[in-house]
A protein has these predicted regions:
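Secreted/periplasmic proteins
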Residues: 2-14, 19-160
């Protein structure tokens, strides 16, 4: 390829990107199904650093959950509705925990949760590695972390 052709292609790239963003930002939206029980599985992780919500996390010693990339609806995950007071209530063999969404699991299917190590340990021994057959649901939590029942879905827009 010649340099002049590359320059012309690159000059048009910002316009093409803007058009794609405008098309993607249209009617595309996804609702977080708050208070809708789902069946699935859980694994655990113990990474530390910045979570998808833009805050420092330590999955080795904090109670939190990473949910599937499929539930995230904004280009900037820091602004995603999942980071605005959404938790996951998980029940397995008579034990229930409620943990805040703080991270994204890029390899998880939409019914697969990646719990922090201490959250997983409250439900099953770490040596088990995977919990199959659990039930879980998104819940809205208040400022003090308490679960607040709501019936309306929380909606966010998607790009692409």
């Amino acid at each position: 390829m010649r340099v002049t052709r590359n320059v012309r292609i690159m000059a048009g790239a910002p316009l093409a990107a803007a058009a794609l963003i405008a098309l993607g930002a249209g009617d595309a939206s996804a609702a977080i199904p708050v208070n809708k029980p789902m069946s699935g599985k859980a694994t655990y992780y113990n990474d530390a650093g910045f979570g998808a919500c833009g805050t420092q996390i330590n999955a080795g010693n904090q109670m939190l959950v990473a949910v599937s990339h499929a539930w995230w609806t904004t280009a900037n995950p820091n602004n995603d509705p999942l980071c605005k007071g959404i938790s996951v209530k998980v029940t397995y063999q008579g034990k229930t925990i409620t943990v805040p969404v703080r991270d994204k699991c890029p390899s998880c299917a939409n019914t697969h949760l990646d719990l922090s190590q201490p959250a997983f340990a409250r439900l099953a021994p770490l040596g088990q590695g995977v919990i199959n057959g659990l039930t879980w649901q998104f819940v809205k939590t208040g400022f003090a972390g308490e679960t607040v029942p709501i019936s309306e879905p929380i909606v966010g827009s998607t790009i692409g």
